[in-house]
């Protein structure tokens, strides 16, 4: 991967090695209408939330001012992760196997469990990077599955 000289100068040796050894396994993107998610929540309530989102995600989204937008963003994130894996909803993967978490600054990250984690191990995915954005009408997400050498683990 080529980085312009001014960017390379800012990177530490560790970052340089990480960039050199990085491989892209897959990319995925998704967009969803927030109204669609709002209607699913209205129609199916707790059943829908419990089927699609983890307790941590429900707690986070429910505490937000625009909770529907946050639920829609997580929906789009889960879909984009599946696309980055290249599997769709096959191979024993469920909605709750993919969890969106946020650090103290709000940066989202992906935690994998169950079938999603197993598939990523088989694909030698070291990290699943995610970007989420939303407004009143739509939410979108972009996922990048980053590869690892066979000896590394996802932890």
Describe each region flagged by the PLM.
Residues 2, 14-155:
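Core catalytic alpha/beta fold that binds nucleotide/phospho-ligands
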